Amino acid sequence: MFSLRALSGVVTRSLVRAPHRRTMSHAARLLPHRVPQKKGPERDPSTLSNYEHFKPTNTTVCLKVDWTDQKLAGSVTYDLTVENSPKNLVLDTSYLDIQEVQVNGHKADFSIGERHNIFGSPLTITLPPNSGDKLQVKIAYSTTPSCTALQWLTPEQTAGKKAPYFFSQCQAIHARSVMPAFDTPSVKSTFDIEIESDHPVVASGLPIKSSNDTGKFVFRQKVPIPAYLFALAGGDLDSAPIGPRSDVYSEPCDLHKCQYEFEADTEKFINAAENIVFPYEWEKYDVLVLPPSFPYGGMENPNITFATPTLVSGDRQNVDVIAHELAHSWSGNLVTNCSWEHFWLNEGWTVYLERRIVGALEGEQQRHFSAIIGWNALEESVKLMSRDPVQESYTQLVVDLKPNGGADPDDAFSSVPYEKGSTFLFFLETEIGQAKFDPFVKHYFKHFRYKSLDTYQFIDCLFDFYANDKEVTDKLNAIDWEKTLFAPGLPNKPKFDTTLADECYSLASRWKDASDASAFSAKDIASFNSSQMVVFLITLSEYEGKDGFSWANKKELISNMGDIYSLANSSNPEVIAKWYSIAILAKVESEYPKLADWLATVGRMKFVRPGYRALNSVDPKLAKETFEKNKDFYHPICRDMVSKDLQ
């Protein structure tokens, strides 16, 4: 799926666009049939707004949380600079109740267009004649029960069972269901956020003043961010420090567990990232641990990462997700893809930085070990997606979301932009040499800071940076850019350091060749960390189908393995998920209801979607019954995706 800053005097910077392309850019030379003949980044096909004509200088959101009717009600106000004198302002909306619109303090005419099944309804606001190049537009509205970004939980659905809870998930195009918006990563704005609530609230900004007594919670986001990074959550929340500039928020009953999980590493991650890129610009980096139905591992909401409770395993083995979300403070939040077609610029860079952070703190062998796990995830995604022509097209690095009136970015979501993107950046580092590549990393993020860009601008920036280095330029020119960016499937596999994986491979090979479990014991994995357990189980799965091998012929062996290593009882959900995957391959029927029960407790799509697909492959009736029984537990995004998976 899926961080922050603190900076003053940044409003004027939010108006700076990415530099215009030259008449013949490097990208146009290398990709003559791909690069659009226009200046600036490509238009985002996933928005109905006419954002090209407007630049927000600030956005003010004032909302009241209606806990009884489960909705947000209030207003959003845009301070805009106008270009080219448009007659109308068009914003994205989805399932919103629009009550009134004011332009420069006066009521304005507006209309809501016919609903597009993916992109929602355009809100068209008539602008007064001769309104000038500065506008203030205020829209009074409320959300509705059909809102796709919000999930509301009853007290019984929370850990503490004391108060209701709600949270938002706006990426990719769900901000339009929370407020009328330029719902595109191409548009950024600073934010003032004022929330009235009977329960504590956190938001994607720095807390200015908050009071449980008055029920008023005020936040300021001083760095311009796109709408998909707007975030709110509320409920029975408390906080504890996990570093000199970081706090963790959770329900009080889980607070000490969450504090323990993150306090050892958070500041180390920040320091390492600052050394790789440049100083952290967001002032505070906090983490909110959400209820189990949160659909992602983490979401990089500025100033407060939203995190799945599956990270809190008690062994501090899953905190690399925090390194990932923190890395978004530079890649994604500070420098942003202009559209979801270029999503790899967000996630590929973030995975690359995440693993650089891991390498800086734990050594290059651990960095490569993490990359091996990522490569396995990429292979799995490409194999699954290659069964369908549309899905296969989403295994390209740069995807096309324009066909057939527009595709849903959520449908294109997979590990591909993460892992194929980071693999490409690792390839560049290897080809150029880390000593030469590191200065480019810093330059790239400084050059595009506060801006949104496309892949072609990335290419231009890369070539421009090495313009006086013939050796590097020759290597860049030798790359098959068409294949790299637009060919579906797997890229060339990098040469990884397998030192930390070799023990896992060896143990997996022993199990493959074994006729019974008599030679195995829990001592086999006594020295393994959770990541090594994951690689061991992945390696077992990869034997399936090779040279006619099938784990279904070794059902009893796999069942015994689960018992010997207590895999279903692991405290780490990554291990549990991979265990059920191999158990399904071996058709261990006793594990089917256990998997169904587990799926009722986790909402993270990384586990939920593969889990349901696996269960559906062996027991469709149980899979569908389990989903029907638990579908209201899942976030709307997750619920929709699993429903499609089971069709």
Curated annotation (Swiss-Prot):
It catalyses: an epoxide + H2O = an ethanediol. Binds 1 zinc ion per subunit. It is an enzyme of class 3 (hydrolase). One of its GO terms (molecular function) is zinc ion binding. InterPro entries: Aminopeptidase_N-like_N, Aminopeptidase_N-like_N_sf, ARM-type_fold, LTA4H, LTA4H_cat, M1_LTA-4_hydro/amino_C_sf, M1_LTA4H, Peptidase_M1. SMART domains: Leuk-A4-hydro_C (SM01263). It is found in: Cytoplasm; Nucleus. PROSITE patterns: ZINC_PROTEASE. The active site is at residues 325, 418. Belongs to the peptidase M1 family. This is Leucine aminopeptidase 2. It comes from Yarrowia lipolytica (strain CLIB 122 / E 150) (Yeast).
